[in-house]
């Protein structure tokens, strides 16, 4: 329950968290500290409106490679528009979630992906509309 409350609004005070789950603020603070210590809570972040920042195009890029692409994480992470990168089982080696300001910038990003050692091809799926995004609780 604490995790769900923090996912909804990580700025809530320990007093508010404690009240919501029937604990004192000190006990809520201690539980959150333990969750961080155990690695359950890895970081505290914000939810940014990407369109407001000029990143209106969201796409998923399937990356094919002729080597183990799991070793390419640092190179892919160096491309600022790459939001997520996952080694996958299926029709490609890696799945990227990317955000760019437009089609030209998406094409520029794909050129950068092709410069990563071992990349032999890509398939890109452009998002037309996001129905919802959520973090599972």
Spans of model-derived segments:
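A compositional/biophysical signature of low hydrophobicity enriched in polar/charged and small residues
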Residues: 1-137
């Amino acid at each position: 329950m604490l995790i769900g409350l923090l996912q909804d609004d990580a700025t809530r005070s320990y007093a508010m968290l404690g009240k919501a789950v029937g604990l004192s603020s000190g006990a809520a603070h201690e539980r959150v500290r333990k969750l961080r210590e155990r690695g359950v809570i890895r970081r505290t972040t914000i939810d940014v409106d990407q369109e407001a920042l000029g990143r209106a195009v969201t796409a998923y890029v399937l990356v094919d490679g002729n080597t183990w692409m799991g070793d390419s994480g640092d190179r892919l992470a160096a491309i600022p528009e790459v939001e997520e990168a996952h080694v996958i089982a299926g029709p490609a080696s890696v799945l990227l979630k990317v955000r760019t300001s437009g089609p030209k910038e998406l094409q520029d990003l794909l050129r950068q992906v092709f410069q990563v050692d071992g990349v032999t091809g890509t398939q890109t799926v452009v998002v037309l509309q996001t129905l919802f995004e959520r973090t599972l609780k």
